[in-house]
C-alpha cells in the first residue's frame, strides 16, 4: 500500500458522503494512528497484510504534502454535515491533530529554500535532489507549506519558472513533461484563466495531443518510465 493510496481514499471519502453512498466512519483514523511514522509523516510503502513499513524505508515529501491536503479537504467537507451528524466534530478534531503532528519542515532545506525529494528516517539522510520547479506535482505541497506558515513565503518564489514555446502556445517546463506533474495539483488548486498555471496546463495538453497524433494521449509517470 502506497501513501498516495491513502490520499485517494481520504478524497473519495468526501465524495461518497456527498453522494450519500456511504456514511463516514473513523476507520481511517484508527489505521493512520497505528501506522509507523517519522515526525508524523507516513512512510512511502506499507504492507497491506500487517501495515508494517516496506523497504526502502523512505518518506516522500510530495506524498506527505498530498496526504495533508487530502486531510484538509476531508475535514472541511465534513464540517458541512455538522447539522446532520454533530459527532463529526470529533472526527474533524482528530484530523486536525494528525495535521498538526505532521512535520513537513523536516523535509525543507532553508539554505536552498526548497524541499528535498524525501528523507531516509533510519539515517536521517535527506535526498540530494530537490523539488525545484514550479510546474511539478510538489507545488501542492509547497502551497500548503507556505499557506500554513510551515516554510517562509520566499520558498514560493524560489521555485523555477522556465518558459518554453511549442506550437501555438508557451508554458512552464516540468522535469519530465508528464500529465501528472502538470495536472495532479489541480485536484485541489485552482488555475484561473489567464494565469501562468492555466496557460502551462493548456501548453502541456496541446503538446501531449500533438505528440500522440491519433493515439490516446496523456503520458504520465507509469507510461513515461515503462
What function would you assign to each model-found segment?
Residues 1-226:
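Ser/Thr/Asn(+Pro)-rich, low-complexity disordered segments
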Amino acid at each position: 500500500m502506497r501513501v498516495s493510496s491513502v490520499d485517494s481514499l481520504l478524497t473519495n471519502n468526501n465524495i461518497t458522503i456527498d453522494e450519500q453512498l456511504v456514511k463516514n466512519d473513523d476507520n481511517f483514523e484508527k489505521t493512520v494512528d497505528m501506522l509507523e511514522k517519522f515526525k508524523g509523516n507516513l512512510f512511502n510503502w506499507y504492507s497491506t497484510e500487517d501495515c508494517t513499513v516496506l523497504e526502502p524505508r523512505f518518506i516522500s515529501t510530495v506524498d506527505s504534502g498530498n496526504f495533508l491536503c487530502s486531510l484538509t479537504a476531508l475535514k472541511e467537507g465534513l464540517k458541512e454535515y455538522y447539522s446532520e451528524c454533530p459527532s463529526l466534530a470529533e472526527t474533524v478534531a482528530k484530523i486536525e491533530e494528525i495535521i498538526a503532528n505532521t512535520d513537513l519542515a523536516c523535509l525543507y532545506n532553508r539554505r536552498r529554500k526548497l524541499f528535498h525529494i524525501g528523507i531516509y528516517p533510519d539515517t536521517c539522510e535527506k535526498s540530494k535532489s530537490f523539488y525545484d520547479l514550479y510546474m511539478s506535482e510538489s507545488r501542492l505541497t509547497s502551497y500548503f507549506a507556505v499557506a500554513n506558515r510551515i516554510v517562509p513565503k520566499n520558498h514560493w518564489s524560489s521555485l523555477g519558472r522556465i518558459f518554453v514555446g511549442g506550437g501555438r502556445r508557451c508554458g512552464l517546463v516540468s522535469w519530465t513533461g508528464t500529465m501528472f506533474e502538470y495536472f495532479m495539483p489541480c485536484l485541489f488548486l485552482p488555475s484561473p484563466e489567464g494565469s501562468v498555471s492555466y496557460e502551462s496546463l493548456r501548453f502541456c495538453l496541446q503538446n501531449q495531443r500533438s505528440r500522440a497524433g491519433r493515439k490516446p494521449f496523456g503520458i504520465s509517470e507509469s507510461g513515461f518510465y515503462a
